[in-house]
Amino acid sequence: MIKIRENDRKDIIHLSFIPDSGAEKNSDPISFRWGDETVLTQTELAFLPQKTYRYVCDGEPVVKKKMTANGEVSYIENMEILPDGDAYSVRLRFKAGKDELLMGLGQYEDGIINKRNSRVYIYESNMRIGIPFLLTTAHYGILIDSESSMIFESRDDEIEFSIDTAYSFSYYVFLGTDMGKIIKLLYEVTGMPSMLPSWAFGYIQSRERYRSEEELKETADGFRSRGIPVDCIVQDWYSWGEGLWGNKTFDSSRYPDLPSAVKYLHDSDIHFMVSIWPNMSPDCDDFKEFKKAGRLLPNSNVYDAFDEEARKLYWSQCRRQIMESGTDALWCDNSEPFSDADWSGERKKPEEERYRAVMDTSRMSMKWDKLNSYSLYHAKGIYENWRRDYPEKRVVNLTRSGYTGCWRYGTILWSGDITASFDTMKKQIAEGINASLSGIVYWTLDIGGFFVVDDKYENRGCNDREHKPLWFWHGDYNEGVKDPAYRELYVRWLQFGAFLPVFRSHGTDTPREPWQFGEAGDRFYDTIVEFIRLRYRLMPYIYSLAAAAHMKGEIMMRSLLMDFPDDDEAGKISDEYMFGPAFLVAPVTEHMYYSPGSVELKDVPKKRSVYLPKGCGWYDYYTGEYHEGGTRVYADAVIEKMPLFVRTGSVVPMAVKKVPMSTKDLKADTVMVYKGADGAFDLYSDSGDGYAFEKGEYSLTAFRYSDKEQVLSTGNEGDTDRFDICFTGR
């Protein structure tokens, strides 16, 4: 076995290993130190020989088609398995401390942040985003430099990675003062998060699905006539003609003049996002073009995103059929295109079985050592070609899966097709934290849950005609928005969503527009509208957080441990988080007014227990009431409020005087200062779109607050005169 140290840095250590021949095992310890302390020791690296195989057609192909939850899938029935060469599986073991928290590794379903004494199957599927980056509280992180499926396992003080297929192997160890520093080292190796346009941080309205350009226009009119801010409306699947799954040409009978419809949205300062798929019906023109070019993955109707020419062809279809209509964003759905073996059936399979099923299916069409990275190459093709053809528009790619480094390609990742329940919502808080600790800055979810109904099959969406149980289709609300219990859940979820990096409503079974939950004067409707407006009041702060992510590697949605590493209690909290440096967010995750089935609840306290970390003081955002850190409070949690606290020393730029209907021409006019500690914040501003900022065309206003003097300054005399300065606290 040949070991190569790839660099001489002390904070980024890159080790590569090449097997000589046969089975090889290296048990010579390799230690990694932070200061005078050994924080991690490699105890074993083993290459285990294995055969790889490929699937070829036996004679004339017998092509079969079937509909799945991920659309139309084609496969060749008469496949033959042939040897394809020699490879290895890799076993990598470390000895670590017994007390540090083990975090990251992507986003999953179980809502568990600390992975100690657990097994994590790192693969790509609906509701799973596998990122082989382990972040710890002991000054180190580990990045596995592989595109293969793999398994992580922790047992007491032992950490093990089992990589399914490799020909050689390397990994990185990052060493730093804190978790934030280690994430910045990750970005140094994999690329910085890209800068999205300002509108991408506004409210995004989606549903499964708008069925015509008239519905798109009516939705835009609904927002503008009611004075509700919105920045984007989304066209989900089935924009194509009947039976032409994945074709990028819109059905002309329902969308007779798409450019005109998009212009209608643009005239109201509303952007347009379109769902696109990598799998295409063999009957559609896009598929035929790929087949003629020989750019499909074997045994599939999925384009070969690993191939540069295939990526160019896919983009050319997007450009001429979608982008030229004026579309502002692409939604790359089903970007893990071989997950149907998991995403089917009445029974949720055990984790090992799910992992093997997806891996076995993927192996029939992809190279075995690249089963996790399809979405990465898919995003790469969108980004590189978009940047060449539309430099005036920043890339926006909403994608269901991603892999290490996908953040440099203009991606927004969402958590997949989750169910509508408070249990799911609570787990999603932890999974959003997990995603951020894995390097994913722009994370979001389906506000209200994607699947809403349970067994009232006639209320199902997605053109579902089978009316049979499916393990993933088990929401708590058979009547959807007609059930006040669902309206309560939706409001709580939207409050949570207003404090995520990307603010997006989506789902099936029931409509999602604000007016579906009532009209002015109804507490559900009024609360929805108020939190959308609050999002826009905070937009100068939020857009500045995005700039800090792009320029400095600061993540937006933060575990409490990021800001309070010395608070042991903070490490136990999985249902609160920091949104930037100022806000502690504590979503409400239980019914207080109704239970499913329109059952009104009596005498349920409208309070939420919130832990406020030590090391600073905290202000209730709504009342300004002060609380000492290191305490637990029972915050007011009536439906109109989500518990929200602001840290002492926070400087928060806002747009207060006039809440805009979109992010266009958005400017900060007020700065909120929360007394009790010194503070700082850099207000970022640019044109909001395009890439001129890369040439220095942006401005930074560096606010600095001295609590002793109770003075806010910028270093430039007269700068603060542009803002109303509002102080909170003693």
Regions found by a protein language model. Name each.
Residues 641-730:
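Accessory, solvent-exposed terminal regions and/or long lumenal/extracellular loops of proteins
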